[in-house]
């Protein structure tokens, strides 16, 4: 064990009071403040505060604009679709024709 332990001094978290004039000014989400700051807690109880400016900076960062490396190969979502739009349209038309043919048959036909 180390006998040279140093205690760090804590500093207060800067806060401001915002007085609302109307109930409609309250945020929709419980983890959001009227000023736009988001906050959260970890399972251990640590408070995480995300300032609006920080979140906007993260959104505009180059890392946020690149896709994750381990995405699944989903045609039309993560990779270009394998079938052109015209082929998909042809398949839809064929399905509609089959439904129309099935609807023309009478359900209660009898041979006399």
From Swiss-Prot:
The modification Phosphothreonine is found at residues 42, 46. The modification Phosphotyrosine is found at residue 30. GO terms for biological process: negative regulation of translational initiation; regulation of muscle hypertrophy. GO terms for cellular component: cytoplasm. InterPro entries: EIF4EBP (IPR008606). The keyword Signal does not apply. One of its GO terms (molecular function) is eukaryotic initiation factor 4E binding. The keyword Phosphoprotein applies. Transmembrane segments: none annotated. Belongs to the eIF4E-binding protein family. PANTHER family: EUKARYOTIC TRANSLATION INITIATION FACTOR 4E-BINDING PROTEIN, EUKARYOTIC TRANSLATION INITIATION FACTOR 4E-BINDING PROTEIN 3. This is Eukaryotic translation initiation factor 4E-binding protein 3-like. The gene is eif4ebp3l.
